[in-house]
């Protein structure tokens, strides 16, 4: 869907074709198993994140004088009396929590599937590593993106064009399209880089979630080559279906599914809290003794 916006296509057929290409690419990778998944993601994810961060830092650094005003605008607009009066704060918080959960999976219990595959002597050490993911993903990368867009708008670049979109030069932009326009203003031709980054983000995310899904599938239906292949074909089919669907439908479905994971996971975390505490204390004790 994001690729449709970035490439300028606006049809179900175009989305399905993009989804088909992605499905073929992801299919080649996931049929190779977890070793190939690890080898692909460990190279792709750091590379794309580094490129994106460098581009953001360049834009922010080139307009460093606007940083104070940008943060001031974020804080004042979030808590101004008008927003409080119309209940906008609650709406923003709800959307913020939804998008944060969507971007970093915090509380969904999905990341633990990948981290549990890591061979480590102490489970708590891997848990601490996992804590870095939401910070880097949401606090660092998302904040940088927001600053780039806000700095771009200080020149009066766009106006509000309805729910989820803004008007730039008479054209309605949504989602990644706004980011692409902001990047292109300061780094000409960067929309192609951003399109590449989105592809890499999307492919790596689909690869990771395919692994989460196959582990859940095995738990429910048992291990077997036929069962595994059925799941993988279903997963690839939904890549095409999702690419052809509308953005609103995808957000609604994703929010519902994430809530369906978060609710039982929170209950599980509550009952497993004593175990987590025990493992953490054991790990901290080892670290303390090592320092002594």
Set out the residue ranges of the language-model regions.
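Inter-helical loop and helix-membrane interface segments of multi-pass membrane transporters/permeases
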Residues: 1-19, 69-90, 155-186, 223, ...
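Membrane-interface alpha-helices at helix entry/exit sites of multi-pass transporters
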Residues: 13-14, 120-136, 223-232
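C-terminal membrane-solvent junction of multi-pass transporters and transport-like membrane proteins
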Residues: 195-240, 275-292
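Membrane-interface loop-to-helix entry segments
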Residues: 13-62, 67, 71-75, 217, ...
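Select transmembrane alpha-helical segments in multipass membrane proteins
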Residues: 18-21, 51, 83-103, 140-142, ...
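Extracellular/periplasmic helix-exit of transmembrane alpha-helices
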Residues: 55-73, 117-118, 132, 136-175
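Hydrophobic, membrane-embedded alpha-helices of multi-pass small-molecule transporters
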Residues: 1, 15-23, 27, 59-64, ...
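Transmembrane alpha-helical segments of multi-pass small-molecule transport proteins
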Residues: 7-32, 51, 194-196, 225-243
